[in-house]
């Protein structure tokens, strides 16, 4: 008989890999997001318990860092620069056109799960 790892098993394994390190929270969050595409609610209680922090503290870290997600991103993530230099050459019009065409707000994902649109600041491509 073969066994299949559950999401809980995978979360526990990720925590175990990092918990003894100094400053384990961000590596744990990065690995959980890499495994699931976002930080699932099911992962929050075990992470908080393992690190002896509150779920509110954990939520504060997740919401502070823009790269962590509460929900899975679309198959394609479109990042549009919001920095001043890009705004000066039409980024606002571009973002309004993209968001309008897709019927999304920033960080939104199309209903079919294909596209997520995110703001970023200075991609260094201008």
Where are these regions (language model features)?
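Signature of N-terminal electron-transfer/Fe-S-associated modules in redox systems
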Residues: 1-125
């Amino acid at each position: 008989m073969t066994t299949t790892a559950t999401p809980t098993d995978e979360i526990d394994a990720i925590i175990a890999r990092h918990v003894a390190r100094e400053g384990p929270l961000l590596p744990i969050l990065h690995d959980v997001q890499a495994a699931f595409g976002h930080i699932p609610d099911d992962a929050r209680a075990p992470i908080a318990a393992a690190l002896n922090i509150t779920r509110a503290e954990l939520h504060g870290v997740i919401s502070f860092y823009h790269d962590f997600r509460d929900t899975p991103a679309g198959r394609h993530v479109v990042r549009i620069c919001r920095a001043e230099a890009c705004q000066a050459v039409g980024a606002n019009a571009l973002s309004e056109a993209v968001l309008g065409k897709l019927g999304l707000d920033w960080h939104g994902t199309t209903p079919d799960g294909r596209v997520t649109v995110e703001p970023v600041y200075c991609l260094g491509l201008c």
